[in-house]
Curated annotation (Swiss-Prot):
Its EC number is 2.7.1.130. This is Tetraacyldisaccharide 4'-kinase. It catalyses: a lipid A disaccharide + ATP = a lipid IVA + ADP + H(+). ATP binds at T55, A56, G57, G58, N59, G60, K61, T62. Belongs to the LpxK family. The gene is lpxK. Disulfide bonds: none annotated. GO terms for biological process: lipid A biosynthetic process; lipopolysaccharide core region biosynthetic process. Transfers the gamma-phosphate of ATP to the 4'-position of a tetraacyldisaccharide 1-phosphate intermediate (termed DS-1-P) to form tetraacyldisaccharide 1,4'-bis-phosphate (lipid IVA). Pathway: Glycolipid biosynthesis; lipid IV(A) biosynthesis; lipid IV(A) from (3R)-3-hydroxytetradecanoyl-[acyl-carrier-protein] and UDP-N-acetyl-alpha-D-glucosamine: step 6/6. It holds the Pfam family LpxK.
Length: 328
């Protein structure tokens, strides 16, 4: 229902407009208070790159963070990542991730980023505390913040916004009548825009999510996803239909598709009930990080990589490298 309202296909958004106006007014006041210096923002001693979005729901932000970390590391830079840790709850903040950190402590996205990139990752509701914790324990050239475009208490040197190229901005209204955290005009003040799927507008960098081989959660075995038989698909991400569409593009027609809420916790009994007999359960990598401890032999996940046009990717990386206060 909420997707229908946000897409502009339902008139019910009209009932939510008063709350949207209130949301918009509050977010504007917060931003202007930092712009005018009425509230102070903390500046890190190294460049901070924000990877965020203007809308709620999955836009492909985490694959961009992973891509950016990997690209900068390949060029010799030391990179750390901070996040609010949404979906996790730690006894102590800031929390520096380790191999034993669980998604219930740090959230699924930070754990995924940590496992994929091996970069130092810290989470805290106050992102500046996470940055300080990273810098205390690591010598870093860049800090990348996963989300946080609207977290103005942390000064930033580069703002990168990720857009869902198919859904774009829906009906254009602020939450809750629409999907917007900030209005589309905010794009005029950011440094780069990456468009995930669909058709990129002028000045935007197009991106596609390319699927890797499917990986077995128990054995680590890899195989082309198309070779899996009797597939049941599940996704607990911001926009599950994107994952199911990816499977369709690969020629996979799941017997069933299960969409779960973003950041949802799972149990063995819950996921085991989704398949029967010879069926294989195929999930996103973000789901997999929450299921490894009780994974079954017929469970697989499908990693995806962000792919950008080489020329535009190089231009983006050169702009970011120019911020570095070190030479490599």
């Amino acid at each position: 229902m909420i997707e229908r309202i946000w897409s502009g296909k339902s008139w019910l958004y009209l009932l939510l407009l008063p709350l949207s106006w209130l949301y918009g007014a509050i977010t504007w006041l917060i931003r202007i208070s930092y712009t005018l210096g009425l509230r102070s923002a903390w500046r890190a001693p190294v460049p901070v790159i924000i990877v965020g979005n203007l809308t709620a729901g999955g836009n492909g932000k985490t694959p961009v963070v992973i891509w950016l970390v990997e690209q900068l590391k390949q060029r010799g830079y030391r990179v750390g990542v901070v996040s609010r840790g949404y979906g996790g709850k730690s006894d102590v903040y800031p929390l520096l991730l380790s191999n034993s950190t669980t998604t219930s402590q740090a959230g699924d996205e930070p754990v995924l980023i940590y496992q994929r990139t091996a970069a130092p990752v810290a989470v805290s509701p106050k992102r500046s505390d996470a940055v300080k914790a990273l810098l205390k324990s690591h010598d870093l050239d860049f800090i990348i913040t996963d989300d946080g475009l609207q977290h103005y208490a942390l000064q930033r040197d580069f703002e990168l916004v990720v857009i869902d190229g198919v859904r774009r901005f829906g009906n254009g209204w602020w939450l809750p009548a629409g999907p917007m955290r900030e209005r589309a005009g905010r794009l005029r003040s950011v440094d780069a825009v990456i468009t995930n799927g669909g058709i990129a507008a002028t000045g935007e960098i197009p991106m596609q999510l390319a699927a890797r081989e499917a990986v077995n959660l128990v054995t680590g075995e890899r195989c082309p996803a198309q070779q899996l038989q009797h597939v049941v698909a599940m996704a607990g991400i911001g926009h599950p239909p994107r994952f199911f569409a990816t499977l369709n593009l690969l020629g996979i027609a799941p017997k069933k598709e299960y969409a779960f809420a973003d950041h949802q916790d799972y149990s063995l009994a819950q996921l085991s009930s989704l398949t029967s007999g010879p069926q294989n359960l195929l999930m996103t990598e973000k789901d997999a990080v929450k299921c490894r401890v009780f994974a079954q032999p017929n469970w697989w996940y499908l990693p995806v990589d962000a792919q950008l046009p080489p020329d535009q990717a190089e231009q983006l990386l050169l702009k970011i490298q120019a911020l570095s206060r070190c030479s490599t």
